[in-house]
Each structure stands twice: as structure tokens, then as C-alpha cells.
Design a protein with these regions (language model features):
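Conserved ankyrin/ankyrin-like repeat signature
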Residues: 41, 73-74, 108-109, 141-142
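Intrinsically disordered, low-complexity regulatory segments in ankyrin-centric signaling systems
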Residues: 1-48, 57, 151-153
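Ankyrin repeat domain, specifically the short helix-to-loop turn at the C-terminus of the second helix
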Residues: 10-14, 43-51, 76-84, 111-119, ...
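Ankyrin repeat A-helix N-terminal signature
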Residues: 28-37, 65-71, 98-106, 133-138
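Ankyrin-repeat-protein effector appendages
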Residues: 2-17, 116, 125-128, 133-153
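Ankyrin-repeat and related helical/solenoid repeat scaffolds used for protein-protein interactions
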Residues: 88-126
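Ankyrin repeat boundary signal
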Residues: 17-18, 52-55, 85-88, 120-123
């Protein structure tokens, strides 16, 4: 596992707990650092007491950002450190909604979220579920994955 440079962690651990967007140090690690540093940085920040499930002013958790970045290693590290797959951002989207939208036919993150209990039938503010979104974007492999997991809507 790559080591996060001391200056990166020092910068993340100094100063205010959240920025003007309501993002904590974990959000900013995911957004601003190289993907290779995510797992070690996540572990170190969580060990220092950073809330893995904190949400910014738009309701995004670090997990939402990791999914958007398509960082499997960050998603895995967040889930291993207690990230909640059911947190909804301001539009009612879960991390699984984001994973379906950003998947680009790579279903590894979707599979991982399902293993950690993500619900493909969570309805967002527009009445859309991850399952229905997979059908709309015509990603039959995700639809098959949901069905293979025997998750019935």
C-alpha cells in the first residue's frame, strides 16, 4: 500500500475542520490528492477521528466523491472504514446512483457497493432508482448484476 507523504497529511490535519463547502479533510483528500494516496490517507484520517460519513453542503460524502472519481481503492477503503452506502445527497442520490451514472461499463465499484449493502431500489428526489437508472442508460450488465444478486425491486 502506498504511503501518504507526511506533508499531505499534515496539511489535511491542520486548520479548520470543514471548508466553506462543508467538506472535511476526508472529502478534500479524495478530491485533491492522487488516487494512489487515497487508501493510506483514508485510514490515517479515520484513525485521527475524521468522520467518514460527514456530508458537505450538497449532501455529498467522501464516498460520493470517491465513486465519482471512479477510485475503486478509495471506495473500498472508505467502506472498510465504515462509510454508509445509504447516505443521500441533496438530490436524493446514493453512492450507488452515482456509481451507475459514472460506471462507463466498469461494474467493479457497483459490485463492491452491493457487497456492502447498497440498495439498488433507493428512490431519489426524481423518482429514479439505481436499478431504473441502469435501464435508462441501457447498461444491461448492471441490470444483470442487480438481478444476479437476487435483489428484487
Amino acid at each position: 500500500m502506498p504511503h501518504v507523504s507526511a506533508p499531505v497529511i499534515e496539511k489535511l490535519c491542520c486548520g479548520v475542520n470543514v471548508d466553506s463547502y462543508g467538506r472535511n479533510k476526508l472529502h478534500n483528500l479524495i478530491i485533491n490528492s492522487p488516487i494512489a494516496e487515497h487508501p493510506a490517507g483514508i485510514k490515517e484520517l479515520v484513525d485521527k477521528g475524521i468522520n467518514v460519513n460527514a456530508q458537505d453542503i450538497n449532501g455529498w460524502s467522501a464516498l460520493h466523491f470517491a465513486v465519482q472519481e471512479q477510485s475503486y481503492t478509495a471506495v473500498k477503503a472508505l467502506l472498510e472504514n465504515g462509510a454508509d452506502t445509504d447516505l443521500l445527497e441533496s438530490n436524493g442520490n446514493s453512492a450507488l446512483h452515482k456509481a451507475v451514472f459514472y460506471s462507463n461499463n466498469n461494474n467493479d465499484i457497483i459490485s463492491l457497493l452491493l457487497v456492502y449493502g447498497a440498495n439498488p431500489d433507493t428512490v431519489n428526489n426524481h423518482g429514479v432508482t439505481p436499478r431504473s437508472l441502469a435501464q435508462v442508460v441501457e447498461n444491461s450488465s448492471i441490470v444483470a448484476l442487480f438481478n444476479k444478486c437476487n435483489i428484487i425491486g
